[in-house]
Amino acid sequence: MGRSIFVNLGLLVVAFSLRGSEADCPSGWSSYDKYCYKVFDERKNWDEAESFCMEQKTGSHLASILSSEEGSYVANLAFKRVKHPSMWIGLSNIWNQCSWQWSDGSSLGYEAWVEGPDCVMMRLQPGFIDWYSVECKSTLPFTCKFLAKREDPAPE
């Protein structure tokens, strides 16, 4: 009995250490690559959602989507948690500078959207993800994202 508990405890420790090897995210946040994400199924306008994200964690903003793989990851998170078929992402032109920008300052390299009004939502459909620009005053669920603190590997 004692050995069984010790072995099970050891396996639990290994499982938790492997889970955190990608990014060191707080409880309730999910990791992908070097970022942490959290989907919120409450409806806010774009400005309120961005402010809410910034209050959650230092460096947190509405999610920037920098690749199709990241877009798929965020969409899969949202499918599990959001009842609405769309959600805010961090792309906008709210400062009317004739250039679209991510709220976290990331470069706009990857895009999957149709240009229109000032803020961008991700439309969630099984097997298909696209972006649409809509009025920033619309209220939608949203995803926050921040750069995770990585654990430095122990020296050998």
Curated annotation (Swiss-Prot):
Expressed by the venom gland. It is found in: Secreted. One of its GO terms (cellular component) is extracellular region. The keyword Signal applies. SUPFAM superfamilies: C-type lectin-like (SSF56436). Disulfide bonds join C25-C36, C53-C144, C119-C136. Residues 32-145 form the C-type lectin domain. Residues 1-23 form the signal peptide. It comes from the Eukaryota. Belongs to the snaclec family. Heterodimer of subunits A and B; disulfide-linked. PANTHER family: MANNOSE, PHOSPHOLIPASE, LECTIN RECEPTOR RELATED (PTHR22803). Calcium is required for ligand binding. Interferes with one step of hemostasis (modulation of platelet aggregation, or coagulation cascade, for example). This is Snaclec subunit B.
